[in-house]
A protein has these predicted regions:
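Conserved short beta-strand elements that form part of the metal-binding/catalytic scaffold
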Residues: 36-69, 114-120
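Short hydrophobic/aromatic beta-strand element in the GNAT-like acyltransferase core
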Residues: 46-48, 56, 72, 92, ...
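Vicinal oxygen chelate
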Residues: 2-8, 13-21, 63-125
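Short secondary-structure junctions
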Residues: 34-41, 91-95
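Conserved active-site alpha-helix within GNAT-family acetyltransferase domains
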Residues: 24-33, 114
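N-terminal beta-strand motif that seeds the catalytic metal site of vicinal oxygen chelate
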Residues: 1-27, 54, 69-71, 121-125
Length: 125
């Protein structure tokens, strides 16, 4: 993105914030989703996972906005990821064929925030 002066913004990290009602309950759920403990716990009501270099998911206690978020994760092998999630006790939804070879599945955290797994994602279609 260019600033008003025409210079590029220097973005180093992108953080997806997921508001929840109970950070400890959600921590356990996201630990199951990611298969590991959080990378950081910078404050009592926030835990975060680095999911790709420069890309973070922050789970933040915010009763007013809990359940209002959608986070999309593009994965290489959708079926393998879904099998792993089922093995860990999560319940992803049915796979839906989208467009141009893209396939989708969704699941919800304890507050109803939607997590979409996307197979067949490409930068250019």
């Amino acid at each position: 993105m260019r600033s008003v002066e025409g210079e590029w913004m220097s973005i180093e990290h992108v953080l997806a914030v997921v508001p929840v009602t109970d950070v400890e309950r959600s921590r356990r759920w996201y630990e199951t989703l990611f298969g590991r403990a959080p990378d950081n716990n910078p404050m009592p009501n926030l835990v975060e996972w680095q999911v790709v270099p420069g890309g973070w998911v922050q789970v933040f206690e915010d009763d007013q906005h809990a359940g209002s978020t959608v986070v999309n994760f593009a994965v290489q092998d959708l079926d393998t990821h879904l099998d792993q999630l089922k093995h860990r006790g999560l319940e992803p939804g049915e796979v839906v064929a989208a467009n141009k070879g893209v396939r989708l599945s969704t699941l919800a955290d304890p507050d109803g925030n939607k997590i979409w797994l996307i197979g067949g994602f490409r930068v250019h279609y």
